[in-house]
Regions:
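Phosphate-binding loop of NTP-binding sites
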Residues: 1-173, 181-192
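Adenine nucleotide phosphate-binding catalytic loops in nucleotide-utilizing enzymes
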Residues: 170-254
Length: 254
């Protein structure tokens, strides 16, 4: 039906399909190694970085590049990449998921990994306060018990998820300042998520992201397993950085 409509990757065919078969996504996603990327900002950039690594590794995959990141759109993407019998033609799926829709997607897709980029206030009109967005993501993770998490160590909201769910966690982050910034002017999360006292920052990378610590309860940025250790060039077009995983340094252009 989705192929006949010629609108794979858009919401309408997926909505129609889900009306006919509410568990369609669960059927189509079965036995597909799936990585979900969610968060307020950076989902598309992060997805394209993962995608490039899959291309270079020769992995058979599809991705929802069309931007259809709601439950209906993700269902449509799986459908157009599956046979008429419901078997996906690819071994892997890279799914960019809207934060609010993620909690529903997790009920049907059993992802192998979930990347959470950050939680910012620019979703205010749709989702209310940042704590509500954070709760949506937590529920999505709770619905994905087999997933390994990749969490942004620089985001005090994002890292709080590690203590809220039992999933194994890998932290990533930026171990060097990028821009001069005043936290009190830019921060969406100036106060400790545990005790509500103001954070102290050793440096800021962007907004409320950076090396934070609470001087009262001790809640602080975890040490990332993989991090940007050097930013050589950054402009509107690209950034030249060095990644460090504790064993080797890897130059990269983003």
């Amino acid at each position: 039906m989705i192929r006949l409509l010629g609108r794979g990757g858009t919401d309408l065919p997926g909505r129609i399909a889900l009306k006919l078969c509410p568990n369609l996504l669960g059927v189509l996603a079965k036995n597909v190694t799936t990585v979900i990327v969610t968060g307020t900002n950076g989902k598309t950039t992060t997805s394209r970085m993962i995608e490039q690594s899959w291309i270079e590794s020769g992995i058979s995959y599809f991705a929802n590049k069309s931007g259809a990141n709601l439950l209906s759109g993700v269902t449509a993407e799986f459908a157009v990449h599956s046979s008429l019998s419901g078997k996906c033609r690819y071994t892997h799926a890279l799914i960019e998921a809207d934060e609010a829709a993620f909690k529903a997607i997790g009920k049907f897709v059993d992802p192998n990994a979930i990347v959470v980029t950050n939680v910012f206030r620019d979703q205010l009109d749709r989702y209310g306060e940042v704590t509500h967005t954070l709760e949506n993501i937590r529920i999505g993770i709770e619905n994905s018990p087999h997933a390994k998490l990749a969490l942004n160590a620089d985001d005090s909201l994002c890292t709080s998820l590690a203590g809220a769910v039992p999933n194994p966690v890998l932290f990533y982050g930026v171990n060097t300042p990028i821009y001069a910034s005043r936290v009190e002017e830019l921060s969406d999360a100036p106060y400790c998520i545990r005790c509500k006292h103001a954070y102290v920052y050793d440096y800021v990378t962007y907004g409320h992201l950076g090396k934070y610590r609470c001087p009262v309860c001790g809640y602080s940025r975890p040490e990332p397993e993989i991090a940007v250790s050097e930013v050589a060039v950054t402009d509107a077009e690209h950034s030249e950085v060095v990644f460090d995983d504790g064993k080797k340094r890897i130059p990269a252009t983003i």
